[in-house]
């Protein structure tokens, strides 16, 4: 246990970083899509890894494929992040748990892979899982192992630190006398749809963990209980399930503080409200509900039963999947991590030598209404801010735009406050377009019809990011206000990358979500993190979040520009805008 398996060769960059770290010390997506089938290809040489559109400050290894974030935790002064990684190429396959450590969740140093096939329970794969801090302060990892060839037969495996005194947790062992700790053999469980154990929580003398599964088309979170964290027994019923949702990948379950309270809670702490999240294999999006937990019955009850179906909320309305939270005891917050896959082609990924990034870590908490979560980039990312430029009280007339100059905007953090300017005696709703209720459950489709170039009443207004000087290439992040059937404003937030690149063979979907915000004052805010091939945006203080991958061919590096635009019929004032260049952190040796 804990030794590197034959055939897993540590790349030179990792060796160097281990030495550097020694001196300093003195991932859902498990379905094997045919387009992502792993090949028996050698590792990609660093010499052909293309830096052109590699992110500057988002998490990624120097090369090859990554997907789900796994088992984030804080231990003895270090943040740990494990993640699904292919050491042999830029496509899915050959998965091991790569391992990086950080003091601040922004600057990362890579260690050797922590978990890899080494016992019968995981001989054919080590898929996603979670970490739990036990009562004595020792971390434990539960993850999904594949123990049979060709059929992806899934079992749950326990791993423990070989040396709990090591703050870097470099070696892990898997006690064969206990593993696998859970199998699909009993209870009529589909053995190929049984994965991704959660962080466990303790209640009434027993540990509980969830494992994602499906029965027919009903997705569910199965409950397992244990007294000693080694021998687990399946409960008679799931914590929760929902019809027609398909397989629940990467479930997550945690308590939240009261409405408006930003302090996070440890997973075993009692909470008045709980969040249950599932990554739906059918849609490849992350959904959550807020509700209550009955610890005696091990049942979860969403506050809004329709939240399992038509009124489902998403962490992010863009390219964001297989997310995982953890409680950060240092900052007393709950932190959300997620995976953003590429949306170019597999040949493109092979050519550039890398695929997949992680979103900037986000702090999440319950909003004052208690009906949704708010998300915001962790404050540590602001340490990367460099040269800044500001714009104040700038009027943008209908059909106009202006450029934000003075900094390099291909790697930037932009915060902007908009204020709608109405003529005396004119209300916001008079100018707003009527909302078609056919789009009530499909903001993304509405954005596809009412994109950034479709002139409207109140909006679209927002940012053109990663734009070329001639605007042939541009990605729009914007708001548009409608008037619903009850005479109330309905706010759409959208990222429209349909003109983001002149390159062919790119997947360029619009992404959108409705913003549950009071815009009667005419004011709304937007923050966008721009990083070469990714745009992460946060509307109305984190009520709606959208991550999009884009691949400009002209608006690259110093040739990328930033604009504010208004394609509505109402004047818009930029009451305040600040944009910062973002520096590159220490990133796994890249």
From Swiss-Prot:
Record keywords: Cell wall, Glycoprotein, Glycosidase, Hydrolase, Secreted, Signal
Organism of this sequence: Zea mays
Family affiliation: Belongs to the glycosyl hydrolase 32 family.
Gene Ontology terms: biological process: carbohydrate metabolic process
Primary site of residence: secreted
Highest classification ranks of the organism: Eukaryota, Viridiplantae, Streptophyta, Embryophyta, Tracheophyta
CDD domains: GH32_Fruct1-like (cd18624)
Protein name listed in UniProt: Beta-fructofuranosidase, cell wall isozyme
Swiss-Prot/TrEMBL catalytic activity: Hydrolysis of terminal non-reducing beta-D-fructofuranoside residues in beta-D-fructofuranosides
Keyword Mitochondrion carried by entry: no
Pfam families: Glyco_hydro_32C, Glyco_hydro_32N
Induction of its expression: By wounding and bacterial infection.
EC numbers on record: 3.2.1.26
N-terminal signal peptide: 1-28
Gene3D superfamilies linked to this entry: Exo-inulinase, domain 1, Glycosyl hydrolase domain, family 43
Domain of life: Eukaryota
UniProt-recorded Gene Ontology molecular function terms: beta-fructofuranosidase activity
Enzyme class: hydrolase
UniProt keyword Hydrolase, yes or no: yes
Active-site annotation: 68
Residues carrying a glycan: 190, 341
Cellular component, GO annotation: extracellular region
InterPro entries the UniProt entry points to: ConA-like_dom_sf, Fructan_Metab_Enzymes, Glyco_hydro_32, Glyco_hydro_32_AS, Glyco_hydro_32_C, Glyco_hydro_32_N, Glyco_hydro_beta-prop_sf
Intracellular or extracellular location(s): Secreted, Cell wall
